[in-house]
Amino acid sequence: VNSVSGDITAEKMECNNFVAQSVSGDVVLTDIICFGILDARSTSGNVSMQKIDTKNMQSASVSGNLSFVGNAGQVTVETVSGPVDIRLESLKDDVVLTGVSGDISLLINASAAFDLNADTTTGNITLQGFDIKAGKESPGTLQGKINGGGYDVKIRTTSGSITIDRNSKS
């Protein structure tokens, strides 16, 4: 589904793959089961995904907020300007969150086992509710194993803070 000037809204559906792209408008996806790739993008607008269950989530925003709540296998998010808020009910594959200007927040289940690599040029990194092992910590960088390690979780923002915390549902 493509839109040049206007919002895209999709809800209560099952699909193999789904792509929603808006040049100037919001993308709002709710209560979707996607067996393949769910791809949501906006050049100038917010991207909001709630109650999602997908094998692979890809999302991008040039200028706007980006949020995701649900289950996903592989997660890839890219933003230029705006905050990112990802709330995963469980960790099923690698996560890559990249931003230029804006805070990035990842909430994940308490039992998730992953290798964390978080980096920011001008911002803080906060890890709450998890213990990190065999790691590297310096201003702007936090690396290490959470719950013994596992999937790769890479978070990078140039100008913004990074928060990794337990999902309140876990």
Language-model features: where?
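Intrinsically disordered, low-complexity terminal regions
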Residues: 1-170
